[in-house]
Structures are given as structure tokens and as C-alpha cells.
């Protein structure tokens, strides 16, 4: 995918990039490749692949969810800034918090935000299980996003506690989502969520199937969730 094709496919979905936004994506690509040489951020570094499998993929939730109607967003397991940074570039009004357990990635994200001139980007070091119990973050966000971090029952425990009641959780998942949805049904309900819709589509250039799972937070998450760090992975809710 060329930079021009990237801009065209977004415009076809109603997201028209300004010259400044196009420059921000180009700068982000260069920073990603540069920093990837000293820390493991991504296995994808070829420009066309980055634009398709990282940038475009990160923005696809906006084809199905109204990002212009939310203010506060948290990206759980945001690592190299996906989906948070592409979404922030496209929707500059967002107040974006990025939580990741690797501190060195926080340095990268802080540098990216500064270099790209992105305001209201807050990288936070920590595990979702810990931060999700803290009053500063718990049930404070209009929207929670996460990209292929874990299976949906586990991911829901990491993410739903951060959403306000009436807010949403959007999970960016790969192929074969039906078994995960069935497996996660009880967990989602227990955590106060309800699956509203699932959108299935193909990434461009035969890069594979993707699924966007959109949940609404309809009840407060019980105080016992998320459980202590490491417990959800060992004993997933089923």
C-alpha cells in the first residue's frame, strides 16, 4: 500500500487527511523504523506493509464506530502505538492514554508524541490488571481500544474495567472470531459488558481477515475485577 493509496482508501471512508496529517504518518513511520533498530517494536518495517498492516489496520475501527463522538480513549497494551497513534493523528481531539507493561515503549511513545506535535497523549507504564483497579483510570474512559493482545475472554477482563458505564470497548481482532465470542460471552456479561456488533472484513492486498468487536459497558464492573496481575492469564473467565 502506497502513501497515496492509504490516503485514498481513508477518504473513501470519510476520513480526509490534511497535508499535516500525511506528514505525521510519514514521520511516525520513520521513527518506528529508527527506534525498532534498538528495541523490538515490530516485525514489520517495509513502508507499504506498515501503512497497510499497522496504520490502516489501526484506523479501521473508525469505519464502524463514531470516534468524533468520544473524547477520552485508552489503548490497552498499546506497545508501539497501535491503534492509538494512527487514531490520534486522524482524530486530533481525542485525549489518548496508552497503557503498556514495558517501560521502554513509553519512551518511544513520548518521543513520537513530541516529534509529531500530538497533544493530550499520555503513555502510562503498568499492567492493565493493576491500573484497572486504580481510581484514576477505572471507569474513566468513553472508549477502550485494544489490538490483538489476547483472547477475548482475557482481553475483556483487561479492558472493560476502564470503560465508563455507557462507554464502549472496541477490540481489533484477527480471523476466526466466532469461537472466541462464544468463549467470552460469560466473561463479558460478568464484567458489565454487552457485545453490540461484530464487523468482519479483509485487509487490503490479501493481508488477511480482521474482526472489529464493539461492546457497550452497560453495568459497573464488580470491584473484584480485574484480578491481580497474572491471575486472568492463568485462570481466564469462561
Curated annotation (Swiss-Prot):
Protein's name in the database: Ribosomal RNA small subunit methyltransferase G
GO MF term set: rRNA (guanine-N7-)-methyltransferase activity
Record has tRNA-binding as a keyword: no
Function field: Specifically methylates the N7 position of guanine in position 535 of 16S rRNA.
Enzyme class: transferase
EC numbers for this chain: 2.1.1.-
Keywords carried by this UniProt record: Cytoplasm, Methyltransferase, rRNA processing, S-adenosyl-L-methionine, Transferase
Pfam families named among the record's database cross-references: GidB (PF02527)
Family to which the UniProt record says this protein belongs: Belongs to the methyltransferase superfamily. RNA methyltransferase RsmG family.
Gene Ontology CC terms: cytosol
Binding site for S-adenosyl-L-methionine: 77, 82, 128-129, 147
Keyword hit for Methyltransferase: yes
